């Protein structure tokens, strides 16, 4: 695939396969943002990685799974005050360009749909991190980290007909949201 040859990322990029076997890049993760702090790191240390170690759903009966980990961004993260990178996987696009000015604008959630979804099924396990910290890296005593899973359906044009895309700032609060499962 030409896109694979141009990007040559050192992290995992997620995609679906079309009926004729072509890659459809409709999934995104923040791995491109983590690359800013981990230029030469191996793909396995990124926040969002595939796993096939027998620990998946029902003892590995269903094969591979995605491991999402909150990762330390090291010295670079301390300097720019972006100390953590959360593992995530979503339908949409991740653009690392605003990472230093407004991290929440990096995520652009969603793709157009034309049918009403009936259900979303899946399996997950969650293990909280050892400590919860504030944006300055100081531990928050007495609180435990929480993972989140949510689905959002929204109108992709505002009342004036302008195209919109939700991002990390408004993914759960935008007035164009028509359904939210959290």
What are these regions (language model features)?
Residues 121-125:
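Short edge beta-strand/loop segments characteristic of extracellular beta-sandwich folds
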Residues 1-119, 142-154, 160-182:
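Aromatic (Trp/Tyr/Phe) and Gly/Pro-enriched flexible surface segments
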Residues 126-133, 139-144, 157-160:
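Extended, low-complexity, turn-rich repeat/linker tracts enriched in Gly/Pro/Ser/Thr and Asp/Glu
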């Amino acid at each position: 695939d030409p896109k694979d040859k141009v990007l040559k990322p050192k992290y995992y990029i997620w995609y679906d396969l079309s009926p004729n076997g072509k890659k459809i890049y409709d999934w995104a993760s923040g791995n491109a943002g983590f690359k800013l702090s981990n230029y030469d790191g191996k793909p396995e240390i990124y926040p969002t990685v595939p796993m096939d170690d027998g620990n998946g759903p029902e003892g590995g009966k269903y094969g591979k799974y995605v491991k999402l980990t909150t990762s330390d961004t090291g010295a670079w993260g301390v300097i720019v005050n972006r100390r953590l990178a959360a593992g995530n996987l979503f339908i949409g696009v991740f653009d690392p360009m605003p990472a230093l000015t407004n991290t929440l604008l990096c995520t652009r959630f969603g793709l157009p749909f034309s049918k009403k979804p009936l259900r979303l099924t899946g399996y997950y396990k969650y293990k909280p991190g050892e400590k919860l910290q504030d944006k300055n890296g100081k531990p928050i005593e007495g609180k435990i980290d929480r993972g989140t899973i949510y689905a959002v359906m929204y109108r992709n044009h505002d009342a004036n007909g302008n195209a919109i895309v939700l991002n990390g700032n408004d993914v759960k609060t935008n007035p164009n949201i028509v359904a939210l499962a959290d």
